[in-house]
Amino acid sequence: MVTIRLARGGAKKRPFYQVVVTDSRNARDGRFIERVGFFNPIATGQAEALRLDLDRIEHWLGLGATVSDRVSSLIKDAKKAA
């Protein structure tokens, strides 16, 4: 099953997440199909905290992809800000 979820990156104690489309059987930070955005939970000042390609996300949702709980709330926030 294809899912849209977060893949963790960044350094220890400084998380940075890629929003990726992947097969649900793959490891969290493993192989993915497409990168559709990023989320920086510790962004401060002028740093961009969230960027999502909503067109590609809608495309994958139309093909039947599921969305993790956290990514679902991020999509909601991005749509509200747009």
Curated annotation (Swiss-Prot):
Belongs to the bacterial ribosomal protein bS16 family. InterPro entries: Ribosomal_bS16 (IPR000307), Ribosomal_bS16_CS (IPR020592), Ribosomal_bS16_dom_sf (IPR023803). This is Small ribosomal subunit protein bS16. Disulfide bonds: none annotated. SUPFAM superfamilies: Ribosomal protein S16. It comes from the Bacteria. The lineage of its organism: Bacteria, Pseudomonadati, Pseudomonadota, Gammaproteobacteria, Enterobacterales. GO terms for biological process: translation. Keywords: Ribonucleoprotein, Ribosomal protein. GO terms for cellular component: cytoplasm; small ribosomal subunit. NCBIfam families: S16 (TIGR00002). GO terms for molecular function: structural constituent of ribosome.
